[in-house]
């Protein structure tokens, strides 16, 4: 009976040992704070039936965006949690967007990340559309140089390519792509 209990205790502790790694898959510390900044570009297209309403010709607000982001990730072994802020200059029907969101995800490969996000976004519209704020949800992936075969060229730099898509109150489609610099 003692051997059975000992074997069960050892097997039960194996997943915990896997989470208590000294380093993450990309070689960075498994626990700490990872600040980052980035520049993204994309497009924000709103539904016709959103709280923004429509102008007389039955159009919907939409426009290209250039976005600056800044945030921190807290690595927790193979997963991470973080917070991110953004400020975006819009074109066409969107003047400015800005917001803050929480992120949670997993490390993927040598230097990549897969994440989900949720937070609050403010949208300042133009061309007759009102300004609004609401919840924003999204998913994305960051791909590091080692994952695309550039490890020898870039060494251990913190540059990652990011692709993400978000939705504003499930009424919009907001694909974005850009470069993120981790420190």
Can you say where each PLM-predicted feature lies in the sequence?
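Gram-negative bacterial Sec-dependent N-terminal signal peptides
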Residues: 1-21
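Gram-negative outer-membrane beta-barrel domains
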Residues: 19-183
